[in-house]
């Protein structure tokens, strides 16, 4: 990788500004899942072990009013980080000003400080100004001035956004480096796109064609096979003229689905049967229906069926690179999670056979965690939108702003 990384920096005695992604689920001050905090630990520990003084920036949720600030302080996140590091994390409930500046100047080597939620800058005195999320140049410059001309970006999850806390700071320091997590994401996702070991199979699931259409188009040019599942598959079924009952589909995307199928030929792999249910409920009456026979009126497809699972297993059997983003069914209901879980199990086999397996997106990640196989796959991406855009081959502002070696 030709980008500057944290290992290239001289950190001792330096105030090191770091952008991390601590946008964790939080309710009433209780963190639902701390995976993103854990993911940033190697870079933070490296800075501290090398006698750097770590100053952490992250956003949390969306701030649209002063009231949102009461619910979305990073204070509980700083406390959890302290537990994970086994050391005190100084938390400053400000995003600028004297209190923040003096706390940073008082930091000693090997100490860590967390700045308040960067998106507090999106609402100032009750007015929505979006200083952080619209990358206000004055704010990026100010935050950059708080450190010693060093910046580490370890927040891949926000790399597709140009914010003051990633691009803004990076543009105002002489050395902007990738943290270990960012470096890993760039390596695995970058290799999958630029130089995959073949056969390369992409699996794209989820509800809407409109959300994933660009990635499907892009991957059809790069992968040997593209498997499409989840709710979006019914738009393709409708395009084939199959009956889809009450299944989710996008009428305005049917023509596009026809075009894609015509262009892709047998490169595009679609489900051949479904688990259809008479209600959107885990205890609904269900039946297995072949796609060609169609889903009866009053029923909706909520998962791929057993023949589709077998088809996907066969498609993946000799794969050497697999990228998976999005569920095959309504994964949050146990009766419609089988297709998604079967993919997770198949990916373990691919990895055991020497293949590279990359998983991105919340539901796919949840599936491999539920199966307990996350550590048996090559890479679990921390970015949803960011990983999709990177796989599409787009330049991500958060990565583009990291210095070249």
Curated annotation (Swiss-Prot):
InterPro entries xrefs: Phosphoglycerate_kinase, Phosphoglycerate_kinase_CS, Phosphoglycerate_kinase_N, Phosphoglycerate_kinase_sf
Domain of life: Bacteria
Presence of keyword ATP-binding: yes
Principal subcellular localization: cytoplasm
EC number: 2.7.2.3
Subunit details: Monomer.
Protein name per UniProt: Phosphoglycerate kinase
Gene: pgk
């Amino acid at each position: 990788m030709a980008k500057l990384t944290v290992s290239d920096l001289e950190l001792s005695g330096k105030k090191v500004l770091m952008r991390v992604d601590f946008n964790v689920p939080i309710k009433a001050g209780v963190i639902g899942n701390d995976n993103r905090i854990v993911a940033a630990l190697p870079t933070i520990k490296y800075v501290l072990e090398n006698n750097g003084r770590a100053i952490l920036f992250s956003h949390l949720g969306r701030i649209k009013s002063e009231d949102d600030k009461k619910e979305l302080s990073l204070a509980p996140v700083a406390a959890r980080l302290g537990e994970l590091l086994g050391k005190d994390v100084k938390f400053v409930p400000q995003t600028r000003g004297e209190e923040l500046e003096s706390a940073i100047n008082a930091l000693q080597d090997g100490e860590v400080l967390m700045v308040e939620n960067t998106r507090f800058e999106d609402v100032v005195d009750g007015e929505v100004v979006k200083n952080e999320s619209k990358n206000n140049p004055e704010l990026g410059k100010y935050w950059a001035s708080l450190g010693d001309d060093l910046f580490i970006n370890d927040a891949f999850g926000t790399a597709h956004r140009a914010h003051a806390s990633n691009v803004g700071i990076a543009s105002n320091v002489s050395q902007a480096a990738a943290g270990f997590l960012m470096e890993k994401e760039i390596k695995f996702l970058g290799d999958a796109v630029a130089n995959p070991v073949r056969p390369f199979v992409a699996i794209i699931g989820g509800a809407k064609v409109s959300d994933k259409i660009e990635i499907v188009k892009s991957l059809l040019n790069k992968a040997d096979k593209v498997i499409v599942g989840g709710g979006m598959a019914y738009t393709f079924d409708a395009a084939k003229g199959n009956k889809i009952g009450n299944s989710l589909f996008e009428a305005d995307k049917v023509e596009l689905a026809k075009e894609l199928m015509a262009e892709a030929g047998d490169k595009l792999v679609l489900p051949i049967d479904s688990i259809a249910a008479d209600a959107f409920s885990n205890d609904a009456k269900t039946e297995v229906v072949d796609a060609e026979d169609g889903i009866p009126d009053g029923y909706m497809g909520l998962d791929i069926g057993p023949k589709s699972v077998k088809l996907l297993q066969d498609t993946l059997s000799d794969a050497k690179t697999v990228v998976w983003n999005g569920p095959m069914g309504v994964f949050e209901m146990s009766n419609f999670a089988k297709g998604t879980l079967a993919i997770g199990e198949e990916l373990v086999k691919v990895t055991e056979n020497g293949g590279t397996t990359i998983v991105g997106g919340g539901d796919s990640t949840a599936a491999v965690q539920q199966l307990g196989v996350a550590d048996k796959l090559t890479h679990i991406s921390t970015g949803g939108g960011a990983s999709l855009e990177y796989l599409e081959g787009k330049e991500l502002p958060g990565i583009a702003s990291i210095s070249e070696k």
